[in-house]
Amino acid sequence: MKPLLGTFYLLGMLVPGWLGYDRSLTQQRQEVVDKVVSPWSILETYSYNRYHPMGEIYQWMSEIREKYTEVVTQHFLGMTYESRPMYYLKISQPSSNPKKIIWMDCGIHAREWIAPAFCQWFVKEILQNYEDNSRIRRLLKNLDFYVLPVLNIDGYIYTWTTDRLWRKSRSSHNNGTCFGTDLNRNFDASWCSIGASHNCESLTFCGTGPMSEPETKAVSSFIESKKENIACFLTMHSYGQLILVPYGYTKNKSNNHEELIQVGQKAANALKAKHGTNYRVGSSADILYATSGSSRDWARDIGIPFSYTFELRDNGTYGFVLPETQIQATCEETMEAVLSVLDDVYEKYWYTNSARKAKSTALVLGLLMSFMSLL
């Protein structure tokens, strides 16, 4: 930990109940951010090969927004159970044409630290390379990226202060006798029907009802409002080295299952080509275990065509406590996989439509010329 940031790391723990309710919500959430960020800039020396506490991630988001004002905006999504603000970054180039949205969230399970590390890596790679890398430039010209670096902020902070292997959120249940909901069992996708528990002490406690948690409400409300334009929903997890497609709650397949598998396998091949890491591709019900209430299945159920869960390194040697020495390689190979998925989304939703428009235009011009020749 950098000496200058030590104090702000501690402030980043944010004791619940701090916010005064006589102030506006905007003032409240700004106070939270003000109290966890350092007055010194961290961006120039920010290491993407380290895990960062939430205070540093808040500050990183603010400084990324300030440095790349031409393409980055920061947006409020909602408040966590313990009254911390949830922000996402929108990376977008101005365009006169409608653009499809790519959604990516990380850290829905608190202990999976490599996931937020990848979200930060993804943002860094896009912003540092979009001007010179033709592949990224083409994608950003036609797609908007919405990135939520840490979804389960309360739980993530708890893994830094108290229990490194904490999984759930930090909501209170049974009169304060047990804590936390598995946010990836709380979405309205065959909620709590299989692979989840109604026991609040369970790691897979599904909550008191679908979307019962403020974090899942915030995400689902936003996604619902944009679903007509969202082409791809990516949620990053660990561990297991898997690319999962819907569904977890049934062995039945989505109506575009073969396409999802094909795109996913291509991504796994791109990932393997980087460092030789093997990933398996399939539905959770087929290659992992049955689950209900996942964000991936919910996203597909509401009509988002491409919906994937990435389970990053490793296969169990280190499990959730993946060493920092593996961050770079993990992020490099995952970046190749994600770009492969985005290439396919681009081909389907932009290139194909453009080609169709060009063909229609050529047909109209041909008919017009034929008509003119008869005059």
UniProtKB/Swiss-Prot annotation:
Residues annotated as catalytic: 311
EC number(s) on file: 3.4.17.-
Gene Ontology terms, MF aspect: metallocarboxypeptidase activity; zinc ion binding
Ranges that cross the membrane: none
Main function: Carboxypeptidase which preferentially cleaves C-terminal acidic residues from peptides and proteins. Can also cleave C-terminal hydrophobic amino acids, with a preference for small residues over large residues.
Protein family membership: Belongs to the peptidase M14 family.
Protein name per the record: Carboxypeptidase O
Annotated source species: Bos taurus
Gene (name only): CPO
